[in-house]
Design a protein with these regions (language model features):
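N-terminal Rossmann-fold cofactor-binding loop
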Residues: 20-29, 44-45, 68
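SDR active-site strand-loop-helix element
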Residues: 21, 63-67, 106-112, 116, ...
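Catalytic helix-loop patch of NAD(P)-dependent Rossmann-fold dehydrogenases
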Residues: 79-91, 113-151, 155-160
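A generic structural motif
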Residues: 13-19
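A short helix->loop->beta-strand "cap" motif at the edges of active sites that frequently abuts
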Residues: 101-105
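NAD(P)-dependent short-chain dehydrogenase/reductase
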Residues: 131-133, 143-192
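NAD(P)H-binding glycine-rich loop region in Rossmannoid oxidoreductase-like domains
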Residues: 42-87
Length: 193
């Protein structure tokens, strides 16, 4: 959802030299052929030696980390806790170390799910109280180093692969839908982010 949208946005802009990394060759078909040469496919992003070598060969000015296991993925397909912690918690810090060595600025995407929602009207000064493994793993992955920016976000948008997100569900409805009362969604679309 987010990684694909961010990749498309920067690939279509001629004022940026963009290289996007995919974890699956099959996803390459989701992008226009004119952009295919701007993609690298690293099927095992957790092959740290290979991934580090590739990043260091690129020497990016800015790296945007969109890698993560989402809450929805965890609910649909139970994933081992070790894998969730590795990708959502440890990987961002490993990536930060490489970016620090290169002088690369790192933008890391986190989530509003580090808050339970019990209090409401949260600000960045509030103490996180994640209710589940997803929120806890994303909180552990947040970066607070020089040359890093962690963005806590809640987004809605089109999913490019499984088409089972909230927006697709809503657009597929042919009649009235039941909703909620007194609920505030303060997220943005992936295009706005």
């Amino acid at each position: 959802l987010l990684g694909n949208t961010i990749s498309k946005y920067f690939l279509e802009r001629e004022d940026y030299q963009t290289i996007a990394i995919l974890r699956d060759y099959a996803k390459l078909k989701l992008f226009h052929k004119k952009f295919h040469q701007k993609f690298l496919v690293i099927e095992n992003i957790l092959d740290y030696a290979k991934t580090e070598k590739i990043i260091k060969s690129i020497k990016p000015d800015i790296l945007i980390n969109c890698l993560g296991i989402t809450n929805k993925e965890i609910l649909i397909n139970p994933i081992q806790v070790e894998k969730i912690i590795t990708i959502n918690s440890l990987f961002p810090h490993w990536l930060q170390r490489i970016c620090s060595d290169l002088g690369t600025r790192l933008i890391h995407l986190s989530t509003d799910c580090i808050f339970s929602g019990n209090k409401g009207f949260y600000s960045e000064e509030d103490i996180p109280d994640p209710p589940d493994i997803y929120g806890r793993s994303k909180l552990l992955g947040e970066l607070n180093y020089e040359n890093t920016l962690t963005i806590r976000k809640s987004v809605i948008g089109h999913e490019l692969v499984n088409k089972k997100g909230l927006l697709e569900w809503f657009l597929d409805q042919t009649n009235f839908v039941q909703g909620y009362k007194n609920v505030i969604f303060s997220g943005i679309t992936v295009l706005e982010l």
